[in-house]
């Protein structure tokens, strides 16, 4: 169970001679490698012909850490970006429709495979980084990122209608204090601690979701004890001290924002975030998040003021160089694929129409349409 893909083997498995639905199903192997809070993997998909529909999975929501479902939608946006990059790698363009407002069925977007199109070197570099991207929750060193990288990350954000703002040196201490305050506020909640514990896994887990203890540098024994301790002990002060020190010592501290704050913006910021993470991975950097500073509404508002941001901060990233970390588990494509149809709705409609004018068999029973009789 790994986010690692044996890319050459997978590429040989691409259904070159298959139909659009088979190709989309294959591309979902890359979509599911996207990051998500607590590795909840809160997405599901329907494939119908040349169209894939992306759904938010409410059963994997985090009501304590993410009461509005903002980070859940962002995770789905990151998965969608992976799928689009994979389609480009295999020579297909994609068109996308974002569904407005709040839908009871959780449908967020539709993407469709379009005509064949050659990929670009920039998109190819991002695609190749998909199986190598990790969330590095361990300490990062204080080396500066490569020259020109931050400007490149800013451009990636703009491609998706978001913007990326580096935290300036003179703003660093105030931002670190906000991170610490967010830590203390979140960890003080028994509900929040129980939620974290529920998604924390022992190192030897057979589960395909959640965060194994090794992601935090825990021993096997500690990985079993940690979720039990969280339910009874508030680690807020320790977490606040650690995270504020990491924020001050991180050379690249970045805030991703959008002009407004709705589901469309959350989805776009998830796509932008994934492009940023992949570009950083391609440059040899590690990344992780300070979710507490955007996860608490009042702290998020104060962050906007502290950095002079006119938009809505969606996520804070820290980038740097660190030790290579093990991947977290991932669910199988069959676990997140809720429906699979070879033909599109349009193709089925065309197939059914001739049946309406066919003669009734002599036995008196109507002959079934081939389209409807298919298994």
Descriptions of predicted regions:
Residues 1-375:
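Acidic, surface-exposed loops and disordered segments
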